[in-house]
Each structure stands twice: as C-alpha cells, then as structure tokens.
C-alpha cells in the first residue's frame, strides 16, 4: 500500500490537504499504541502513518514520492546545475539574510510561493510526459524553495520573538 492509498487519496501532486489531515488524524486514533492490543505492531504502524503524512504534506516530498513510485527517484540529492536558477537562488538567500521586517519577509514568501507554483506546473508536465530527468531537476528546485520557506518561517518567528522580548537591564 502506498502513501496515497493509505490516506485514501488519488496518486497525484495536487491533493486535498484537509482530507490528508483528516485521514491522518483518523488513522492515528485507530492505530494509537495506547489503544492497541499489539502495542509493538501499533507503534510500527503509527510510525509509518507519521512518515507517510510528513511525505505527502509538502509538495517537494510529495513530488519526490511520485517519482519513487515510478522508480525514477535516483540522483535526487545531486546538486542543481542550472546557472540562472542558482543565481536567482543566491539572490533570494541574500534577501532573506538581509530581511529586517515582517513585511519584507511576507514579500519574500510571496516571491518564493510564485517560484514554487511555477515549478509545480513544470513538474506536472514533466511527470505526465515521463521526462524523468527534468522531473528530478524540478524536484531538486522544489526542495530548495521548501527549505527557503522553512527559513522564512524561522525568520518570522525570530522577528516576533525579538519584538516580544524586552531587555531586563532596562528595568534595573
């Protein structure tokens, strides 16, 4: 049984994330180790459910998993050789490093999301045409942008923490 079947979803890049979450919670309840007669087996199943959910939750890992189902997921850890992409990626990273406001981070998030949306469209075409080399390259780029999104989340959290914190020395 593949991850999509586990959550009763179509084998596709575009899935209903609300259904994924709902089915995940239902399966977690069903296979919770504290409620099972065979706790070891339930623990294994629960771990599989968690891993499948994590894989399908993000578009980059979902795309990589689709390639794995077609046995086309080899060399996904290779570096990206597209010079123009690498140049744009470096500029994005620099912008993130220099971001000092939540507004700047929001703008950056929108830009990254636009890149991701374009790459999702590319992946769908590559996948449907079975252009596996291009599909793998697109997954590498999706992974990069997913990491940037994660870093934007961290930067936003850090900004919020900085705004909420106060200097104890000022009070004494």
Curated annotation (Swiss-Prot):
Pfam family, one: DnaJ
Organism superkingdom: Bacteria
PROSITE patterns the UniProt entry points to: DNAJ_2 (PS50076)
Residue ranges of domain J in the record: 2-69
Alphabetic keyword roster: Chaperone
A Gene Ontology molecular function term of the record: protein-folding chaperone binding
Matching SMART domains: DnaJ
Gene3D superfamilies, per the entry: DnaJ domain, HscB, C-terminal domain
InterPro entries xref list: DnaJ_domain, HscB, HscB_C_sf, HscB_oligo_C, J_dom_sf
GO biological process, one term: protein folding
Complex and partners: Interacts with HscA and stimulates its ATPase activity.
NCBIfam families per the UniProt record, alphabetical: hscB
Purpose: Co-chaperone involved in the maturation of iron-sulfur cluster-containing proteins. Seems to help targeting proteins to be folded toward HscA.
Family: Belongs to the HscB family.
Protein name, as recorded: Co-chaperone protein HscB homolog
């Amino acid at each position: 049984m593949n991850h999509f079947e586990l959550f009763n979803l179509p084998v596709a890049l575009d899935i209903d994330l609300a259904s994924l979450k709902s089915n995940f919670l239902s399966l977690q309840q069903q296979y919770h180790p504290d409620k099972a007669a065979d706790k070891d087996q339930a623990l294994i199943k629960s771990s599989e459910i968690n891993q499948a959910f994590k894989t399908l939750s993000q578009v980059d890992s979902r795309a990589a998993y689709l390639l794995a189902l077609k046995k086309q997921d080899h060399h996904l850890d290779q570096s990206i050789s597209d010079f123009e992409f690498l140049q744009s990626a470096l500029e994005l990273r620099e912008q993130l490093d220099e971001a000092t406001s939540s507004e700047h981070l929001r703008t950056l998030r929108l830009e990254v999301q636009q890149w991701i949306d374009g790459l999702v469209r590319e992946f769908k075409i590559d996948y449907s045409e079975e252009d596996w080399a291009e599909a793998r390259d697109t997954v590498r780029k999706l992974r990069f942008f997913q990491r940037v999104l994660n870093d934007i989340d961290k930067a936003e959290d850090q900004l919020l923490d900085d705004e909420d914190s106060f200097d104890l020395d000022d009070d004494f």
